[in-house]
Amino acid sequence: MQNDDQNRSGLGLLRYIWTEWISTLVVLVLLLLTLIIGTGEMIHGQLLRMGERIYGDPATGMQYSFLRAEPTRPQCERNINVDQRVQQQIKADAADEYADFFGVRSEADVRAAVLQAQQVCEESYLFYDKAIQHVQAHPSIRAYRTFETSFFGIFKFGTENRALLLVIMVVFAAISATLKTHHIGLRSPSTRIDFKVYSVAMLVANAFLAFSSYSQYQSVLNSGVPMGEMKYIYWLWMILFSALTLISLYQVIKQPKPTREGGSFGLAFLSVPLYAYMAITTGINFTFFMDYPMGQGIYLGQLVEFSSIFLNLALFIWAGMLLKQTRVVDMFLNILRPWNLAPETLTWLILLAAALPTAYTGASGIFVIAAGAIIYKEVWNAGGRRQFALAATAMSGSLGVVLRPCLLIVVVASLNKEVTTDLLYHYGIYVFLLSSTLFLVISLFFAENKFRIAAPTVAAPQSGRAFIAIIPYIVIFILIWLFYKYALSTDLNEFTAPVMMPVILLMIVLFDKLRHEPAPLPAVGHWDETLTATLNSKSTPELATAGAAANAEYREAEHSEQPGKEMVVDHAVQRSKATEILRKVGFWKSMHISTSETVGHIGALVILMALSVSVGGLLERMEIMEAFPTDISSTILVISLIVGLMIFVGMIMDPFGAVILISATVAPVAYQYGIHPVHFWMITLIGFELGYVTPPVALNHLLARQSIGDAEVAEADAEVRHLSFYYRYERWILPVIVLLPAMLIIAYVPYVFKLFGWYP
């Protein structure tokens, strides 16, 4: 990513104003509006109930719902001459040209109708008089109903225009992500040749998308079908991709300043964002081979169709960036640090704990960005290999995809009536326990020191003090949960988590900043450099002595942003600078930082997901999924084909896009073969976990690199070049040898041993 502070004049100033202020402010307003939409129904229901309690009068039968609008005087005539009105109506009936066809009413029928109308009119006047008296007796009702109806108007507008809000958010976020070179790729561009290849690829990709959006608009326009509000969405797509094309064209002509010299043409292709590859691939196929240029634009419509899901994803991303502004992760690690655990054991505990925030941030990889750097630093400083620490960082954002309230499972349940969220979350716990246990077993197998722990007499008091320090944050969580539960009659679940988590984290950030909390405590240094206990692969594990633990050296990986460079890690003993910087950041500055980061991640992730759906659409139109055999008699063979297909799909597609494709194509075929729906989706979900950490996409590895920094990852790779194959590529191999056996166990064991009553 480029440093926005490098150039604050001319176009650089305009870019800075757009990315740091205009788009940040607009997206913040849209996120807050999304929060209002999400909580609007529950809040409005409470406002109506409160209005009834305050202004309702059971004695007179007056309800607040009658008074939400100013009472209007009835237009009917209150006092009439009944006989005269009856004669007038009889004459009018006689003059009716259809009277002979329907028959003429008798005088008694006409009189009854007139009397009934007079009674209704009198009741209207009585209600009007009673309502006016009630309003005059409660003058504050006008102010209250103005507030209540105004809130309802905002809520109603937002609910009816979710798709429009999402597309506007994506427009601002995607432009900012492009200006900041924030799109997700295998590595960031850094050399002159990197930027040249990057810019040309982005130009071609965005040009395809712009042309496809225009083709779709023209197709709908020529069809004569009324577009309604979709007209604005079509225009926004065309504006977005036209703007991105112009930005890419400018970057081709005037390339960003390289951050280092050298580079090669082949390696430069690693700098091209994944969404650009997807856009070019689908654009070429749809336009030139299928004569379907509007294909990409049509599949972008999936974002509109599932606008609620993607708005929730945006809220989860915001929650993750707010988490990054808190000390929660570091304070949790403070509880573990005194025990000086072996890196493998420490990592296992971190992964267990990380699964919950991963699920509560939508399983979108946002937790890796929010906490990846501190997890990496903690595992490495505990004595773990840097490659092992990188693997742990990537896996910290994948194990939670099967836990409540993961957004991915909500998408699965919404597209497949055969399963429910409760069923998937229930069996997801078994998947989580299996995969996390396998991680512990396999990582201990490759560990240099199998076991290490500090003396409980030393560690327990320190750990207890660290737990006491985190109690206020637990109290904040409980108070907000109780407020939603009892004040708004809403519990925390997979449907309300996207709305509640940003509110909880906003309060935690505010709490941190009001208390002027110091910087996070530094991580424990390498054990073998500081402690007297001799711990190596041949020794018997020992407890650390009190003196050794007391004299342990504490280090903080000082991450400094240097102009034009990625995050550089200096493992010197430096702590004061970070502390002072964190103390100077107030609440509003933290809000600005978190929202600005949210903008970039929304732009990068949502566009990637949209193009992933487009790739799924291409595969669907190529009828690749229809190649799945339909005459197989062996269930084991069917399961094997599903496993292979899920691994393939997980490797090349974002899970949110893959769910849409699989639900429409593979799932119905699997059900026909007798594969239990829950079993099928457990295989699919563990396949997505594997896909998160498996090349060529390996999204969590890319996000971990983004969090930790290219320079640090390069150093980690460089220091193991002389070692064996496994240790050279441990960050790629370890997640695979953990999750692949887990997937095979989940795929075959329930069928072979007839578990859970899924198979007769």
What residue spans do the PLM features occupy?
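Alpha-helical transmembrane segments of multi-pass membrane transport proteins
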Residues: 2-760
